[in-house]
Amino acid sequence: GIRDLVRSRGLEMCIRDREMIVVCKPEDSAMWFDKLWQNTVDLFRSMDIPVRTIECCSGDLADLKVKSYDVEAWSPRQKKYFEVGSCSNLGDAQARRLKIRVKSKDKGNYFAHTLNNTVVAPPRMLIAFLENNLCADGSVKIPEVLRKYMGGIDRIVPNDNK
């Protein structure tokens, strides 16, 4: 069951993340950061998973990062939040290393800004989904947003045939 699935802590840390990458003009960097972060938050909330956002302090940022948010989902089993995604703005640091430039007639050549967002880490999303939609009878509630992909069913019911 879910307890056995979650108990194998390796599942939480499987690295099969789905990243969103943006290369943009410096003046669009803040707007893209907000969009990327909101994509992750909206995805989890659409599945009835409570999330919060932690802004990483400058001392915790990796070398190239200018700004970073961690998105955390609530774990009813552990009674705490755990990280399910991360959104980072690297400013022009990564573009400088990779020599990614923008050509502009007005401003000449300048370095682009790069951003990345771990929008989905499937194992961690599965844990958050199951824990937050598990019912007392052992069934799993299907959030409204997923029902059209599930043939309209609103619950997954355990099979009692053993």
Language-model-detected regions and their locations in the chain:
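Single conserved hydrophobic/aromatic residue that forms the stacking wall/gate
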Residues: 1-15
